[in-house]
Amino acid sequence: AEYPADLGGDSGRYTSGADRWVSNEPLVGKQASYLGYILVLAGLRTWSLAYDWVMPVQLLFTAAAACAAFGLGRDVAGRLAGFLAALWLVENPDIAIWNRYLLTDSLYISSLVITLWAWHRAVIRWKPVLLVAAVMLLLWTMTIRPNGWILLPLMVLFLAFRLGAWKAVLTVALPGIVLLVVAVLLLKPLQSGIQNENPMDFLSKGIVIWDYDAWNREMPPTEMNSTNDWRNIGSYAMRYPVETLTLVAARVGIVLARVRPYYPWQMNLRIGIRYTVMYGLLLLGLIWYWRHLAVKLLVAAIVLHLGVVGLTVASWDGRFLTHFFPLIAV
């Protein structure tokens, strides 16, 4: 089929998944890890709309995310800060470009901002309807991309922190995290979802940027077949802590730098100037507003997303930074 929407390497996974869902066939491979996006496409097909209609859906979510970014920025530092946060979300070409792609990135970027805004509002006002809406948004965002699952422990800790007592941490946060760990270790669908991302294979091969071998790091050899199970990451990291941490730091560093050796120098210059300014403003914002609850929530979300990159790979096109760039903008 021909699509006005631009297609990426993974677009076929989502359209095929939507076709299978509408036909009441089980999802295959990595498709279950992107259930939320596949359901959006399946809904379009159910309504006899072409998959290209996902573009206006993504634009609507971007508009909602801009409003959420405005709300977060306003809560932290006033209306001007909110306006700038919303502006930097919608005018950033690195984010806007994904609105026209039949890929999960645009919807995840927008949903992440909306979800964090909803949770911040919910724990400030403590109204049942807001808490229910925040939980629903959390579940939605978790299903768009595999890295959305990091929001679950984040929100458990955020809720416990908001309650403001060690008793709350012990009664809410720790049991929640323990249950999550048990689920990851015991539930086959979650295990398969993690294994499908090949984190142990990426680690053993020293891959920094996906599909760019020039920057791969030489790593110590692994035992036979050890790369077939992601749970071997722990034992490998304990055996080679320096090499593992160096690789993780390289991945995180290249994600934050955003430039790439294969980009034109003019593009790298533009990116370098933009993100140098943004990181400088981020540092000032942390110094001035660290005590604000929303800032702590946003920083925690940024750190967790960087952690996911550290355990997997940096993207070839730099898109992983765009997933949480609006949080930096706020």
Short names for language-model regions:
Residues 53-76, 114, 280-284:
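Transmembrane-helix motifs of polytopic, lipid-linked glycan transferases
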Residues 6, 32, 53-61, 84-114, ...:
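Multi-pass, polyprenyl lipid-linked donor-dependent membrane glycosyltransferases
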Residues 31, 35-39, 47-67, 98, ...:
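Loop-to-helix entry region of an early transmembrane alpha helix in multi-pass inner-membrane enzymes
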Residues 183-265:
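Membrane-proximal stem/loop segments at transmembrane-domain junctions that anchor or position
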